[in-house]
């Protein structure tokens, strides 16, 4: 029995050290070395105060700010309740909520009734915490933001261009605008 127990305990100890100490330290080291900002949460500051993360959406409702995607994550982008709605595409509750959001989006942005509304403006993301909106969504909100801040639409469009992220690896997904970064840039004007 001792002949079998000693190798088993040795392997348990070796793999505990590898998977419990060596591997986590290596991953943390690589993350800090090559992706320090992301590994530390991509925290954004204003006046030396941390106000959020570039990776987690925040609720903005004032007319002078760009509005994020709708969130199913509790009240106002509650990270502790992160999730999508889990309602299927034919669910009556989801369809009614999307129709209501389309009407509200057109109204708050003074858009004609026949304006196509970007899907990201009326549907939540899988996590419910998506920090970005599409470029089309941002451009449709730009006139409202410019009017509320009493600045030119061109200034707002320039900020949108400056804060548009490229596609992942240059070809994956769509270009997107980080709402928190864009709103912080607006506040700096």
From Swiss-Prot:
Q: Which UniProt keywords apply?
A: ATP-binding, Cell membrane, Ion transport, Membrane, Nucleotide-binding, Potassium, Potassium transport, Transmembrane, Transmembrane helix, Transport
Which molecular-function annotations from GO does this UniProt entry contain?
A: ATP binding; P-type potassium transmembrane transporter activity
Q: How does it sit in the membrane?
A: Single-pass membrane protein
Q: Which one GO biological process term can you cite for this protein?
A: potassium ion transmembrane transport
Q: Where are the transmembrane segments?
A: 5-25
The protein's predominant localisation is membrane
Q: Which GO terms describe its cellular component?
A: plasma membrane
Annotated localization: Cell membrane
Which InterPro entries does this one have? KdpC
Subunit structure of this entry?
A: The system is composed of three essential subunits: KdpA, KdpB and KdpC.
Q: Which family does the entry's similarity section mention?
A: Belongs to the KdpC family.
> Function of this protein?
Part of the high-affinity ATP-driven potassium transport (or Kdp) system, which catalyzes the hydrolysis of ATP coupled with the electrogenic transport of potassium into the cytoplasm. This subunit acts as a catalytic chaperone that increases the ATP-binding affinity of the ATP-hydrolyzing subunit KdpB by the formation of a transient KdpB/KdpC/ATP ternary complex.
PANTHER family attached to this UniProt entry: POTASSIUM-TRANSPORTING ATPASE C CHAIN, POTASSIUM-TRANSPORTING ATPASE KDPC SUBUNIT
Q: What is this protein called?
A: Potassium-transporting ATPase KdpC subunit
This chain's source organism reads Mycobacterium tuberculosis (strain ATCC 25618 / H37Rv)
Q: Supply the gene name.
A: kdpC
